[in-house]
From Swiss-Prot:
Enzyme Commission no: 6.2.1.54
Segment forming the signal sequence: none
Naturally occurring in which organism (per UniProt): Listeria monocytogenes serovar 1/2a (strain ATCC BAA-679 / EGD-e)
Catalytic activity: holo-[D-alanyl-carrier protein] + D-alanine + ATP = D-alanyl-[D-alanyl-carrier protein] + AMP + diphosphate
GO CC term (a single one): cytoplasm
Keywords for this protein: ATP-binding, Cytoplasm, Ligase, Nucleotide-binding, Virulence
Name of the protein in its database record: D-alanine--D-alanyl carrier protein ligase
Annotated binding of D-alanine, by residue: 202, 306, 498
């Protein structure tokens, strides 16, 4: 088997040229078309970009086949891609563009009117289509392609300073992850994969590349569908899905529909979950409704290429433990539980920080050497990452014990609570604030903002909340905006003068 991701995907253009690699709402892209178009785009980039190949290419859009073409074309030109979804606020896009310092900004959809990209070439959607037409039939030099330890993609995650961090994932990282998924999860040729997560969220890698590498079909549910529950419930059975990849929260939403079951989705026999805690209640109900299905619970940070552990969730597993295990580490990785202060490796049964070592671990954050050195390190010749997650090993399984800092997972999105607080403090009506996660069924249900407001003229608190949210929407993604607002005149403080978060947490999670 060749190790190049591109060679393996392109091979399907010969084996099954007319089979769809992407299909949704009447839009269909075959493997032959994917190869021809990505070849054309790779040729265009090689002829028109003279900048350093270390500089990535930003691809802006939303779950369209053109994004796949742009991703693979970028790789064929020797450059990593940075996916940026249309749902991101303008300020966030500007932050990513500044941090990534890209060689080109590619638009598969129109940019917002209030966003102007400067400092690098911008390729509009029309220009992209024109490039595909003009370079049709050209094949880029294979030697130019991303390979080995070259960056393959860079995904930006929430950062504690309010600025996103770019996680560099190499070709080798992605090969390691993809081979593990295809083998351990028994994913055969020609399956239809649900694509629920936007490409800017690393959960999408769990469906995108296993699908393309196995000659399968990617079936996206874009934001217009997922925003309307009636449309969502109608579309899912119509797509004849084989493999379900999502956050547990998305599955919970679908379980509200009594028709979400095996009878209406006869081909759906694999569920892969990542991004947040899978509750026992969710897993149990899925097993009831889908008796032919296998459910996998997985765990991993963006810094270790999506996921590094897995467990097949059975009735026996559900009954045996108070919470579901995250599973066992993939074969080419090691997992240590360490004392956060001393770094000493702890024995099974003791709680500590999860440290990941091996083939899936990123080289670090793009253009951020200091932040990289804080959490990445060399362990006996292997790349290692301090996750900041607390865990414990029992019966050989990893169990999640929460975050060691203020970072949480909400509906699959990794969020730094400090990031939200720093952004809230930009709002004119907020003097000080603290963000508290409200827990339900072993996971974060929503974010609660405790706020000391500035002087204002609003008569009702809901009017103040509306004004705050209006300002926030200008520079913060919707998923980071708190759902509940509590207003205070002051905060309880600890002995050293810091906000007493334990006290605030006990108020929210009574």
């Amino acid at each position: 088997m060749t190790t190049s991701i591109i060679e393996r995907i392109d091979a399907w253009a010969e084996k099954t040229p007319d089979f769809p690699c992407y299909e949704y709402a009447g839009t269909r892209l075959s493997y032959k078309e994917l190869k021809r178009q990505s070849d054309a785009f790779g040729s265009f980039l090689l002829k028109n970009l003279i900048t350093d190949k270390e500089k990535p290419i930003i691809v802006y859009g939303h779950m369209s086949p053109l994004m796949l073409v742009a991703f693979l074309g970028s790789i064929k030109s020797g450059r990593a891609y940075v996916p940026v979804d249309v749902s991101m606020p303008v300020e966030r896009i500007e932050q990513i563009k500044k941090a990534a310092d890209p060689s080109m900004f590619i638009c598969t959809e129109e940019l917002p009117n209030n966003l102007t990209i400067t400092g690098c070439p911008v390729l509009t959607q029309d220009q992209l289509m024109d490039a595909l037409e003009k370079h049709f039939g050209e094949v880029p030099d294979k030697e130019a392609c991303v390979n080995n330890d070259d960056n393959y993609y860079i995904i930006y995650t929430s950062g504690s300073t309010g600025n996103p961090k770019g996680v560099q994932i190499s070709q080798n990282n992605l090969v390691s992850f993809s081979n593990w998924i295809l083998q351990d999860f028994s994913l055969s040729q020609g399956l239809r994969f649900l694509n629920q997560a936007p490409f800017s969220f690393d959960l999408s890698v769990m469906d995108l590349y296993p699908s393309l590498l196995s000659g399968g079909t990617l079936v996206p549910l874009d934001k217009t569908i997922t925003a309307n529950m009636k449309d969502l419930y109608r579309e899912i059975p119509a797509q004849n899905l084989d493999v379900w990849v999502s956050t547990p929260s998305f599955a919970d939403l679908c379980l509200l529909d009594e028709n979400f079951n095996q009878e209406n989705n006869p081909r759906l026999t694999r569920f892969l979950f990542c991004g947040e805690v899978l509750a026992k209640k969710t897993a149990s109900e899925l097993l009831d409704r889908f008796p032919d299905a296998v459910i996998y619970n997985t765990y991993g940070p963006t810094e270790a290429t999506v996921a590094v552990t897995q467990v097949k969730v059975t009735r026996e597993i559900i009954d045996a433990y108070p919470s579901l295990p995250l599973g066992v580490i993939k074969p080419d990785m090691r997992l240590h539980i360490v004392d956060q202060e001393t770094g000493e490796v702890l024995p099974e049964g003791e709680k500590g920080e999860i440290v990941l070592i091996g083939a899936s671990v990123s080289k670090g954050y793009l253009n951020e050497p200091e932040k990289t050195d804080q959490v990445f390190f060399d362990y006996k010749g292997y790349q290692a990452y301090r996750t900041g997650d607390s865990g414990i090993i029992k019966d050989g399984y990893l169990f999640f014990q929460g975050r060691l800092d203020f970072q949480i997972k909400l509906h699959g999105y990794r969020i730094e609570l400090e990031d939200i607080e720093n952004n809230l403090k930009k709002v004119s009506y907020i003097q000080n604030c603290a963000i508290i996660p409200k827990m339900k069924d072993e996971k974060v249900d929503m974010l609660v903002a405790q706020v000391i407001p500035t002087t204002h003229d609003f008569e009702k608190e809901y009017q103040l909340s509306a004004a705050i949210k209006k300002e926030l929407k200008e520079f913060m993604p919707a998923y980071m905006i708190p759902r509940k607002w509590i207003y205070k005149t002051d905060f309880p403080l600890t002995m050293n003068g810091k906000i007493d978060r334990k006290s605030l947490n006990s108020e929210v999670n009574k």
